[in-house]
Amino acid sequence: MNHMTVAASEQSFQAVFNHLRDGFHETASGGGDFGPFSASYDVGVRLEGGTIDLQNNNTVLLSELDIVYDPLILRLGIDIPEICVGGFCIIPSPFGCILRAPRICIFSADPDIQIDLDLSGLIESEISGTFSIDTRYFVDPGRPAGMSDHDAQDADVPNKWQLFLNPGWLDIDLIDIADTVGNILDAAIDAAIDGLLGWLPGWARSLIRAILGPIVALVRAILDIADDIQEWLSNLLGISLGLFNTVVTLVADYFASRYPFLEFEDPIQVLDPGVNLIAVKVPIRDLDVLVTDDEMVVTANVGA
Amino acid sequence: MKARVNTCAVQQSCLQSSALGVLGSIAHPVGRPGEYSGRVMQGKSQVAEFSLHAGPDVDATQVTIDLARIAGSPLVGQPYKAHKYSVNSDGYLMLFVSEGLGGFWVQLSSQGTYRSRVVFDSRRLKSGDLFIATLIRPGTHQAKMPRAVAAIRVRAPEASDKAFQPPPPAGMTCTKTGFVPKRLEVYATQGIVFGFETTSRVQIDLTKPAPARSAKSRRSARWRGRPDIRR
């Protein structure tokens, strides 16, 4: 028989989880070189929604936790081809060209363009998973050795029992990429090329655009975008850049080791201080957690 | 974002066979086996020299020399190096300028047993020589040789779903009576090959640039109707 038992209903657990969820705001960046182009991202991630379902196997099922990408900036770096004139055959023969005009490059050195895509709020994904509840004892590193428990409470460095949500498995599902991404990409390509050629005389800009051909189609080809830009973007972000893995890792790390969803001071205060009386504190030992279908039950013993 | 534009090519409005610059090149048939030496001049200064071996034993039918690349800068004390080339004796010496202000001309001399003899001077092109011009700026150009002119209209490529590929080079011949044909219409970046039936030189000037064409046509909405005025 335990000395102390505290129970929290599923609703209460959901409220505590919501509070913890709302504190999540992480940032990450990454990138890679993929031959004809490079890509990198800067992302800020928030969490919304998410339903808690307590399970009688001592776990917590989390479903439909929405990932809000705000901001999500995807940067694409592209080498557009050299633009050269000449190189045509002047004297052909059945055995090949006898005399060929020299090739003169009028726009060279593999000019780079960078296309910035602001994808904030255009990608919907959600996380589901199960968590067990880990109990850990925390000794504040800021607490000097020999400091009394009362002094530690006053200095806000008390020892604590902490409960963490330790993920068993987490899945991230890409729900949707907005249709407007295609239009955003096309407009960004046009703007980048205009910026690159902007200082040239108008006739030279028109000539270079004519030699390059439809620039949007050219850049899409360099990026290896087939018909389905959503699928391309999903592969780029999810597989090539590993964004979704990064997000899952951030979420798992946040819940499992950075922020406890519940914590108790040790020793716990059971009577407030009175006149000429100090607060009464009792030490907590053998903290344990049991999850059932209906509630989470925390048990503990009192003892030195 | 970085870009390198061949500004001399973009800004050039005059091409001369006698003072070679970007977008112009000269092909000279070597003709005879032997050892040759070349002097590369820029204005009045010698900026490079080269030797050329021409023989039936050489496979290459063309030796291409970028005069801008081999030229030293005598004004800043940069000495030029001697360059060695070889070509089939039935092949061509191709001279061009990849970048810079240009103004190059070349003398080629055959190295005889006792003395050298100038066999080619790029300021005076002869039968068999070719001057190749690649005009990139749309507009009307005038080709000139002593006592003769011809008009060349350079058209801008049409906007298309495909990358622009210029047609094969057009031809023009410099004869004793002038250019044949006297008028030519080409697309920007399409080559023009000038042949010579008489000793001459060619200069091409931009006389009237094509009017600037906006990349996107402007559209504006207009409301037409009778204002409803009530008194």
Where are these regions (language model features)?
Chain B
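Extracytoplasmic copper-binding redox domains, predominantly the cupredoxin/blue-copper superfamily
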Residues: 1-231
